From Swiss-Prot:
It comes from Arabidopsis thaliana. The keyword ATP-binding does not apply. It catalyses: a plastoquinone + NADH + (n+1) H(+)(in) = a plastoquinol + NAD(+) + n H(+)(out); a plastoquinone + NADPH + (n+1) H(+)(in) = a plastoquinol + NADP(+) + n H(+)(out). Residues 47-72 are annotated as: Disordered. Disruption phenotype: Malfunction of the NDH complex. Its EC number is 7.1.1.-. This is NAD(P)H-quinone oxidoreductase subunit U, chloroplastic.
């Protein structure tokens, strides 16, 4: 009875990974075993330093390649630019022909020639690297627009509409038609034999008709 009158006190049981207060009566008639929560930790196989460095170099190389990728020039073909051209408003204030030093109705070959000449002039000016890159980007932008059929058509159409807003111009009216560089196929000589025979036959019938008409009138 003395054991029953004893006041039970909570005891602190230490469990690996956790600390939990368990109320363990001191008058238990059976042996008490603390429960231990076990946790499984899955460890990935160790990799050597060469694999880690190779992976780091791959990631670094891909990011560098993305950063160094050339930026494409913005396209002039958009719904907003089409709407502005229809209203007779300019879609850009850049004179792409003036940048390359060429005329509006020049051929595509002349666009390439003008681009190469402008690049040569810029390199001979002795500009620093940053200024040269800035001007080269502008030259490349103009060359890309004027050397692409769809982009140049949109640009020329906008120029034609903004110059004469009261007169509507179709986009294909401003296309630069490239002259054919192929020689035309040789023409076959026309066979005039059947035509000549037909003419002789009709002439003979006319002569015969006149002769018969004169004979019957006598």
């Amino acid at each position: 009875m003395a054991s029953l009158s004893t006041i039970t006190q909570p005891s602190l049981v230490h469990i690996p990974g956790e600390s939990v207060l368990h109320h363990v009566p001191s008058t238990c008639s059976f042996p008490w075993k603390p429960t231990i929560n076990t946790k499984r930790i899955i460890c990935s196989p160790a990799r050597n330093s060469s694999e880690v460095s190779a992976e780091a170099e791959t990631e670094g190389g891909s990011s560098t390649a993305v950063d160094e990728a050339p930026k494409e020039s913005p396209s002039l073909i958009s719904a907003l630019n089409v709407e502005r051209a229809l209203r007779g408003l300019p879609i850009t204030d850049v004179d792409h022909y003036g940048r390359l030093g060429i005329f509006r109705n020049c051929s595509y070959d002349q666009v390439t020639i003008g681009y190469k000449e402008r690049v040569k002039e810029l390199k001979e000016q002795g500009l620093d690297e940053e200024q040269l890159k800035t001007k080269m980007d502008l030259i490349k932008e103009s060359y890309t627009i004027l050397s692409t059929v769809e982009e140049r058509r949109m640009y020329d159409w906008s120029l034609a509409r903004s110059e004469k807003a009261e007169r509507y111009v179709w986009p294909f009216e401003v296309d630069i038609m490239e002259p054919s560089r192929e020689e035309p196929p040789p023409q076959e000589p026309e066979d005039v034999g059947p035509t000549r025979i037909l003419g002789y036959f009709i002439g003979a019938w006319l002569v015969l008709g006149v002769a018969l008409s004169v004979a019957f009138n006598r």
